[in-house]
Structures are given as structure tokens and as C-alpha cells.
Amino acid sequence: METSTGVLSDIQAMGEVVKGTGALLVVDGISGVGAVACRVDDWHIDMLVVGSQKALMIPPGLAYVSVSDKAWTKIEATKRGCFYLDLLKHRKVLPKWDPAFTPPLTLLAAQQKALDLILDEGIENVWARVSKLGAATRVAIEAMGLETFSQAPADCLTTVKMPEGVDGVAVVAHMRDVEGVTPAGGQAQLKGKIVRLASMGYVNRFDIIVGLTALANALRKQNVDVDLGAGIDAFMKALD
């Protein structure tokens, strides 16, 4: 899942291409893991990088890396040294649960609680819930008279294309400062052109309704005719 655009890549298909070669499949799972299916072994993922701040529901500060046997062989053959991100050093101390460096203990405690929530619900149920919320959000956006940006959308994030002439930066600022809802805007060449709404983690249907309302109010400030009622009605029907 590419966070800045809301595009979901077909990692399974990529794995089928890479598995018989000497290349490594390295996957950015920072936003996707915990929200959409990601089957490391079945999809032949060699390295999966995950962050704590998205679907794993805690502040940024923790990162996780899974490494395949194929990737370990490549790492072991690399002569160039490194320091903090030395995976070989981390692997050496892992069996003893003796971190190579001082760990962020408060974040680890928070992560344990967040993972308990995921395990209690069941990861397959989490994926299904996020999928339903994401699909319903896209339906709502279209019913409001707006467009989504991604042609291959991820369910954990909906990217809304700003209408012609609308300042997306001002939309984000209004939602945050006036409506009390903090969305994400676009990055680089998409800055001011899109607004991103999450449906991952602990976000529920009521949070999304509040977000849609905030977006509609921000767009109305720029004289955009938005049918919020139709959007919320379509959203609720899509969840039934």
C-alpha cells in the first residue's frame, strides 16, 4: 500500500515474478500491515518493513522487519558495515531478548495493547472490517459528487481528488482547525490536490461520518457544492 496516493500494489503477483530469481522482494508495509492482507511466506516476500504509526495504532517510533532466508544470505554476503540498522547484530541478540540498543519501552507497552486488540478481534475480521469501511467511504465520496484519486484503491485509505480550483491545503487546514478533524494532504506534486481519509486501525463508521462532514464543510467554504446527505446515506447503505 502506497500511503501518499492510496494505491494498493499486487504484492502476490510481484512475488510470483521474483521468487525464482536472485532478486529480493522488499515490501513497504508501513500502512498496509494490520489493515489489509499481507501473507509474507505465501507471497514470497523477502523483507517486509512495518511501522507502528498506521494500522498498528500507536505513535511513530517502532519499526519491524521480517527477513527471509534468501535475504539473510544476501545480508551475510554484504561486506559494507553499518551501525544502528545492523540486522545481523539484532539477529544475534534476539534469542536472548537482549536488545542491541535501548528500546522505547513505553511504545512497546502501547504496541502490546494494540496487538491485543487486533488479536481479540481476529486479523481476518480486521481485514474484513477495513475493507468494508474503505469501500463504503469510496461510495460516499462519489455520492457527494467528488472523485477518488486512485484507480487501484487501498481499503485502509481513501484519497479524494480536489475539484478544479480548490486549494487542498486550505481544505486540510479548515478540517483541522475549524472542524477538529485532522486528515492528511497530498505530498510533492500532489500537495494541494488531494485529501486522504483513513479507515484503518481503530477508526470506525462514526469517525468516517465525522470526517466526511468536515470535508464537506471545508469544501463549501470554497464554494463547492457537496451533497453530504447523499454521501452519508450511501455510506450507511454500503455498510448494511
Residue map of PLM features:
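Active-site phosphate-binding strand-loop segment of PLP-dependent enzymes
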Residues: M1-G34, M47
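Conserved active-site segment immediately N-terminal to the catalytic lysine
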Residues: D41-Q53
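Active-site C-terminal subdomain of aminotransferase-like
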Residues: Q53-V139, A143, D240
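A short linear hydrophobic-aromatic micro-motif
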Residues: G145-T148, V181-G186
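Conserved PLP-binding catalytic core of the aspartate aminotransferase-like
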Residues: E147-V178
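A common structural junction motif
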Residues: D177-P183, N217-L219
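PLP-dependent enzyme catalytic core of the Aspartate aminotransferase-like
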Residues: Q189, K193-D240
